[in-house]
């Protein structure tokens, strides 16, 4: 992670605009923007142009950035005591990709970034991960398109639990209903049919859903 020990220096007007945008975006979406999203918002056609501004903000002590993560920007607080207090009450959960709630899509296992939440929200442990939902097949379970779901990593589940299931390298969120000769993954929307898995070699459970976070407009 890029970092600096220099004291903070005054920002230019452009740097301040982008810094404030990053703070606002992160607060509203529970994750930082990507370099491309920043460029699109400010009509900066070159990603190198955005990166140069981010590099200046890093050097001046306003942000950190993990170049290997698409959402690797971190806002730095200038209040050390406040930062320590916040850090002790929060935990960063990895976002490992998007998951289909509807027609399954190819699971993206590369880290998209992290989301910071209150430790009490999920009684968090180190084995929790987050995924972004795409689709409306679980709306009657209170899981909507664009929601961020939280799942505890585990390879088994009880009948009727909501799981993140992987089928042939694809991932989907469904109710888990196993039987002797197959697994039925049931949606929570009458528009969709259950997914029947006959060959268990192509099926695995990645985790059990334990929470959901939604952006409220």
Swiss-Prot record:
DNA-binding region in chain numbering: 35-55
Top enzyme class: hydrolase
UniProt superkingdom: Bacteria
GO cellular component: protein-DNA complex
Active site as annotated: 137, 174
EC number: 3.4.21.88
Annotated GO biological process: DNA repair; DNA replication; negative regulation of DNA-templated transcription; proteolysis; SOS response
PANTHER family: LEXA REPRESSOR (PTHR33516), LEXA REPRESSOR-RELATED (PTHR33516:SF2)
UniProt xrefs under HAMAP family: LexA
Record-stated family: Belongs to the peptidase S24 family.
Quaternary structure annotation from Swiss-Prot or TrEMBL: Homodimer.
Biological role stated in the UniProt entry: Probably represses a number of genes involved in the response to DNA damage (SOS response), including itself, recA, uvrA, ruvAB and ssb. The probable consensus LexA box is 5'-TGCAC-N4-GTGCA-3'. In the presence of single-stranded DNA, RecA interacts with LexA causing an autocatalytic cleavage which disrupts the DNA-binding part of LexA, leading to derepression of the SOS regulon and eventually DNA repair.
Name used for this protein in its record: LexA repressor
